[in-house]
Structures are given as C-alpha cells and as structure tokens.
C-alpha cells in the first residue's frame, strides 16, 4: 500500500535562498534566527530556554539547517541519530508567496511574474474598485493600502462596523485582501464580495483574493476567525495532485490546501483551524487513508499568527507543540508510507517588516525505502513533486529531479 503524507509548515524557512539578494533577504533564516533568539533568552513569553525540537531533529532538521547555512542552529548539533532523509531546497519560482511555493512543491514552478499592487497608499486602481463596489452594491470601502492584517483591524475595524464599508488592503505579495466583521457585515456577504473581486482581478494577474473575517467589539478584542478563505487562480499546468487524482488516487486536503490549489487535484476537503485542530484532523485522515492516497496539511498558523506578526516566542512555542505531537503521527506510519515535511517560503519573525522572506525550505523525508542521510541541495521545490510522482509510479513531472528511485 502506497500513501504519502505532506506536512507543510507554512513559512518555516531554513536560511536565505541563493537569490535572496534580489529580495533584500540576505541573512533571513526563520529556523536559525528563532533558535538564536531562544538561546539568547529573547523568546521566553509562554515558554523558556533553547528551542526544543527533538523529533524534528531526529528527522534531520538540524542537519538540513547546517547544510543550508553552514552552521548548526543554537541548540542543535551533529550528535543526533538521524532516522530520515534530509535536505534543503531553493525555489525556482519568481515569487516568495504561498501559491508559488505550494505549486512548485507539487511539480509546477511559477516562472512568470505575478501582478502586484506596489503603491503603499492608494494601492488599487480606481477602475478596479469601482467595478467591485458596483457589482456588490456598496457605496465605498476603507483601507486601500499595504498593511498588517491585525494592525488594520485596530485602525479601521470600528469605522468598518459603523459604515458597513469593507476594508481592502494588500502587501508585498500578489494579494487582494478583504476584511469584514463576520457578524455585522456577514460571512456570506464577505465571501460573495471576494468572489466578485476574484473575477474582476483577472486582468491584473493577482495570485489570491483572501477573505479575512473577524469578530469583536473594538480594537482591544478584534480577532480573525477560522473562516478565512483563499481564492487562488488555478495552477498553470497539472500538479502531481492532479496526476494522482486522474490515475484514480485520493488527495485529501486538510486546512487551506484546497484553496491554494484552486481546488484542482483534490478529492476530499477537511476543514480545520488552529494548530491543534489541524494536527488532530491530519491524524484522523491518516488513519482513514487507503492505498494511493495523499493527505496534505498546511499548518498556516506558523505564518499567519507568528511569522507575519513577528512573534518569535509564539513561533517557537508553536514549533515545540508541533514537535511534541509528531510521535503520534509517526506511530501511524506503515512500512511503505512516505512522509514529507517542508515549507513554502520563509517568514522570519526577527526580520524587518511583516512580509515573507526568500528562503530555502527543509526537505525532510521518511519511509518509501529512503536511506537515512543527506539529500543535499535540491535546486527546486519541484524535486518533491517529482519524487511523489516516482513513488506512485505516475507520469513524470516536467520539472524536478526525484530523490526516490
């Protein structure tokens, strides 16, 4: 029986990519800089001491970080018996965004440029917003700028509730984000508005429209809910997920995976929100998985709750929670299963600003007859997609080199 389980630690980069200079990200290292802050006592909120990830270390995380950066992250060393295959991957895709990282990992790099809203203020063309408002029957909107999602709620959340006008904002990524109060504006109204925006954004080549529902009564208690929805464009060609589905296999999305792939190549969608619920749902789907199945989970909290918010202690605590639960998952693996742990980009919480960082990602693989030891530098995330194709004996992907023979 052949099954693959993919754990996407969203934003968990392990050192600046080879082309990080083009992005202003030389020195970025999500894993290493979190470990350094922990070792220096700068991440002792809700936790304390060095970064403790013994199970990830056994899968080769520390060694992959060493190969990527030339040094072991504080608290990690070569004196660990590694049981898995480990490596690190550079990104071929032109951007450091979520769809690019996910699609490339599944064998389809994004070799074209996304559209972006580069102006920090008055970010959106009036022609675009006029069309969206007219179709939605709205009189106006708030925002129209680059912003942190939490900060803009503090600044404009109350005005949004008073006026009924949605909050439109963007970032350095190819995104159009819409924040609305889940109760006063209505979740269904927000989702319909985002569907309209997705349709109108076609000519602008924007990768995602993101619905950002929130609740609360004022700036002190506004909080996002778990009903986020991503409206992505479809990948430019078939991913390994599509190929397995087309061959009669099953592809189970846990969390926001289905949204990222525009629901292409997915046979089952499991909704879950929050690190604990995502891990619980992953375990349940592994227990149910039959032959020729992929279970693919995105652990978005690392990125959305801690990376973008530059919360080093929160990120470290979340990683330690994830690590503590790994043995539950490992106990469910069967002899021929393939487990992959990776990331889609970096989001170094010690880095200036609030955007993603251009980083290499870990490639931690266990099972499928792989020998423990180094996989070295992978020149594309697509090596993972090609390896999955090899594992399931599917038609080869156009990009990537398999590390499974």
Curated annotation (Swiss-Prot):
<dbReference type="Pfam" id="PF01676">
    <property type="entry name" value="Metalloenzyme"/>
</dbReference>
<dbReference type="GO" id="GO:0030145">
    <property type="term" value="F:manganese ion binding"/>
</dbReference>
<keyword id="KW-0963">Cytoplasm</keyword>
<protein>
    <recommendedName>
        <fullName>Phosphopentomutase</fullName>
        <ecNumber>5.4.2.7</ecNumber>
    </recommendedName>
</protein>
<dbReference type="InterPro" id="IPR006124">
    <property type="entry name" value="Metalloenzyme"/>
</dbReference>
<dbReference type="GO" id="GO:0008973">
    <property type="term" value="F:phosphopentomutase activity"/>
</dbReference>
<dbReference type="InterPro" id="IPR024052">
    <property type="entry name" value="Phosphopentomutase_DeoB_cap_sf"/>
</dbReference>
<feature type="binding site">
    <location>
        <position position="344"/>
    </location>
    <ligand>
        <name>Mn(2+) 1</name>
    </ligand>
</feature>
<feature type="binding site">
    <location>
        <position position="308"/>
    </location>
    <ligand>
        <name>Mn(2+) 2</name>
    </ligand>
</feature>
<dbReference type="GO" id="GO:0043094">
    <property type="term" value="P:metabolic compound salvage"/>
</dbReference>
<feature type="binding site">
    <location>
        <position position="345"/>
    </location>
    <ligand>
        <name>Mn(2+) 1</name>
    </ligand>
</feature>
<dbReference type="InterPro" id="IPR010045">
    <property type="entry name" value="DeoB"/>
</dbReference>
<dbReference type="GO" id="GO:0006018">
    <property type="term" value="P:2-deoxyribose 1-phosphate catabolic process"/>
</dbReference>
<comment type="similarity">
    <text>Belongs to the phosphopentomutase family.</text>
</comment>
<dbReference type="GO" id="GO:0005829">
    <property type="term" value="C:cytosol"/>
</dbReference>
<dbReference type="GO" id="GO:0009117">
    <property type="term" value="P:nucleotide metabolic process"/>
</dbReference>
<comment type="pathway">
    <text>Carbohydrate degradation; 2-deoxy-D-ribose 1-phosphate degradation; D-glyceraldehyde 3-phosphate and acetaldehyde from 2-deoxy-alpha-D-ribose 1-phosphate: step 1/2.</text>
</comment>
<feature type="binding site">
    <location>
        <position position="303"/>
    </location>
    <ligand>
        <name>Mn(2+) 2</name>
    </ligand>
</feature>
<dbReference type="GO" id="GO:0000287">
    <property type="term" value="F:magnesium ion binding"/>
</dbReference>
<keyword id="KW-0479">Metal-binding</keyword>
<keyword id="KW-0413">Isomerase</keyword>
<dbReference type="GO" id="GO:0006015">
    <property type="term" value="P:5-phosphoribose 1-diphosphate biosynthetic process"/>
</dbReference>
<comment type="function">
    <text>Isomerase that catalyzes the conversion of deoxy-ribose 1-phosphate (dRib-1-P) and ribose 1-phosphate (Rib-1-P) to deoxy-ribose 5-phosphate (dRib-5-P) and ribose 5-phosphate (Rib-5-P), respectively.</text>
</comment>
<feature type="binding site">
    <location>
        <position position="10"/>
    </location>
    <ligand>
        <name>Mn(2+) 1</name>
    </ligand>
</feature>
<dbReference type="InterPro" id="IPR017850">
    <property type="entry name" value="Alkaline_phosphatase_core_sf"/>
</dbReference>
<keyword id="KW-0464">Manganese</keyword>
<feature type="binding site">
    <location>
        <position position="356"/>
    </location>
    <ligand>
        <name>Mn(2+) 2</name>
    </ligand>
</feature>
